[in-house]
């Protein structure tokens, strides 16, 4: 069709293959290329893992590990046993002896004819400990006098067992001849053995070459007694011990909590001291100091951190720093009474309890004077709660010291001055809780 159109328009024909009978009848087979199916990455599989499983040819991963060193499809390097390729090696039934045995026993095993080694291959594992020996002269000079009255026959039997069983004292105690030498425990065998070793090393001047082991028999006996008592505990004793451990953990937790509260109080007092120093240079402070000086001319109070905190409260220092919204554009006056976000939940709860205790309106009308006074009041309430917590901590410490003193000194009672004991202890405890 396209050729006819080109003839009508006098256009050149395209180079098309000549139509023949064979091509028209399609007698020759056409070469159809197989469409390649692209393998898709399964869902949930990482791209790196998929790239390791599939090669560039997009072949599926093998079901079994193969070694293609001999070519594709060769499988493993040695897929079949190559029998008859080498000459058969000869074996013989040969005798051998174990050098670890002293009875000259002869055994047999199979070995190669070409193997000319005569040593037993497992003889290298025959490691023996060096047990010292002594002569009659050395025994009479150094080993005869001992606390537990060991005889030479008993000592010889002990060292014979030590050589036979390589210082396995449990086995040595089991093999001890009780009929001839009496009953000996494992601790007694160890004590006598290490005593003899130390005396021989001292007599032969070998203490500098190798450190001598010192065996504490009393410590070993106490250790075994404690282990035996621990093993024989009843179920009630185990439960009681677990209960005591849990109580000890609770006491430690309460102690850490008190220490943390003490540190917070110290920080609060230091902040009050700094604010007191900063506020001491203001005109209002100077007037206040002049009034105090006129009223208390003859009184000279002792300076302390508590006084500095009280003075800071009277001057106007606050435990809560409220946001200053004067230069931040248009805002509601009630936003000035909003608590800052950096206050912890514990202080917020303590402040709410104090407001309920003193029956203060939690949301007063936000006038200018009420906002300032309400913020100062809440700041003083927070400081009051901190001081109450510190006071209860001090009371608890005094009571614990009193009990410790009475326990250490029976029959004596520690009298605490009434000035140090708060009057309303229950109210303090309720406020801190």
UniProtKB/Swiss-Prot annotation:
Residues 252-305 are annotated as: Disordered. Residues 288-299 have a biased composition (Basic residues). GO terms for biological process: DNA repair; DNA repair-dependent chromatin remodeling; immune system process; negative regulation of transcription by RNA polymerase II; positive regulation of antimicrobial peptide production; positive regulation of innate immune response. Residues 186-281 form a coiled coil. Disruption phenotype: RNAi-mediated knockdown is larval or pupal lethal. RNAi-mediated knockdown in adults results in reduced expression of the antimicrobial peptide genes DptA and Dro in response to septic injury with Gram-negative bacteria E.coli. Adults infected with the Gram-positive bacteria M.luteus display increased expression of the antimicrobial peptide gene Drs. Residues 252-264 have a biased composition (Basic and acidic residues). Residues 268-285 have a biased composition (Polar residues). Keywords: Activator, Chromatin regulator, Coiled coil, Cytoplasm, Immunity, Nucleus, Repressor, Transcription, Transcription regulation. It is found in: Nucleus; Cytoplasm. One of its GO terms (cellular component) is NuA4 histone acetyltransferase complex. This is DNA methyltransferase 1-associated protein 1.
């Amino acid at each position: 069709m396209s050729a006819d159109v080109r003839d009508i328009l006098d256009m050149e024909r395209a180079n098309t293959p000549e139509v023949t009978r064979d091509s028209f009848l399609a007698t020759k087979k056409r070469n159809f290329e197989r469409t390649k199916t692209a393998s898709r990455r399964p869902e949930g599989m990482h791209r790196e893992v998929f790239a390791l499983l599939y090669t560039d040819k997009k072949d599926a991963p093998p079901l079994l590990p193969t070694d293609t060193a001999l070519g594709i499809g060769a499988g493993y390097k040695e897929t079949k046993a190559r029998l008859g390729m080498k000459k058969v090696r000869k074996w013989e039934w040969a005798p051998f002896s174990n050098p670890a045995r002293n009875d000259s026993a002869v055994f047999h095993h199979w070995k190669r004819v070409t193997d000319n080694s005569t040593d037993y291959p497992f003889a290298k594992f025959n490691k023996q400990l060096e047990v010292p020996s002594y002569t009659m002269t050395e025994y009479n000079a150094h080993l005869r006098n001992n606390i537990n009255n060991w005889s030479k026959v008993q000592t010889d039997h002990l060292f014979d067992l030590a050589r036979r069983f390589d210082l396995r004292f449990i086995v040595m105690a089991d093999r001890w001849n009780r009929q001839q030498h009496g009953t000996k425990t494992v601790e007694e065998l160890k004590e006598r053995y290490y005593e003899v070793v130390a005396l021989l090393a001292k007599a032969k001047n070998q203490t500098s070459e190798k450190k001598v082991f010192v065996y504490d028999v009393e410590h070993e006996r106490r250790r075994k007694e404690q282990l035996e008592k621990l093993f024989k505990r009843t179920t009630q004793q185990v439960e009681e011990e677990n209960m005591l451990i849990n109580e000890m953990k609770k006491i430690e937790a309460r102690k850490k909590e008190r220490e943390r509260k003490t540190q917070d109080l110290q920080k609060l007092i230091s902040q009050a001291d700094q604010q007191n120093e900063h506020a001491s240079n203001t005109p209002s402070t100077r007037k206040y100091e002049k009034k105090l000086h006129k009223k208390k001319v003859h009184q000279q109070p002792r300076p302390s951190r508590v006084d500095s905190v009280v003075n800071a409260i009277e001057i106007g220092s606050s435990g809560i720093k409220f946001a200053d919204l004067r230069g931040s554009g248009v805002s509601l006056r009630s936003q000035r009474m909003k608590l800052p976000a950096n206050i912890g939940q514990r202080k917020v709860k303590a402040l709410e309890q104090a407001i309920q205790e003193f029956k203060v309106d939690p949301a007063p009308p936000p006038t200018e004077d009420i906002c300032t006074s309400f913020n100062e009041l809440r700041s003083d309430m927070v400081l009051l709660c901190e001081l109450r917590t510190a006071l209860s901590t001090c009371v608890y410490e005094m009571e614990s010291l009193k009990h410790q003193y009475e326990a250490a000194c029976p029959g004596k009672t520690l009298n605490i001055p009434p000035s140090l004991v708060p009057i309303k202890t229950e109210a303090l405890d309720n406020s801190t809780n």
